[in-house]
Amino acid sequence: MSCCGGSCNCGSSCKCGSGCGNMYPDLAEKTTNTSATMVLGVAPAKEQFEGVGKAAESGEAAHGCSCGSSCKCNPCNC
């Protein structure tokens, strides 16, 4: 399990790995060929420290790996 609810992880050069920012990929904006935008849903409110326990369970807390603002690794100790 990676930090940020399983969506972000620290990859090479301490940049967040694949899946970063895709907490709810099925709720992303979709566009059609007619250039119309359809919003499929709204995500529920999140707890401020929701990912802290998950990172600790996975052992990433020992490496200092967590995702900060704009899904950047914070601190950069991966």
Swiss-Prot record:
List, alphabetically, the InterPro entries matched: Metalthion_15p (IPR000347)
Q: What GO MF annotations does this protein's record show?
A: metal ion binding
Superkingdom assignment: Eukaryota
- UniProt keyword terms in alphabetical order: Metal-binding, Metal-thiolate cluster
Q: In which tissues is it expressed?
A: Expressed in roots.
- Inducers of expression: By iron deficiency in roots.
| Family designation | Belongs to the metallothionein superfamily. Type 15 family.
Q: What does this protein do?
A: Metallothioneins have a high content of cysteine residues that bind various heavy metals.
Query: What's the name of the protein?
Result: Metallothionein-like protein 4A
Q: Which species is the source of this protein?
A: Oryza sativa subsp. japonica
Gene name as annotated: MT4A
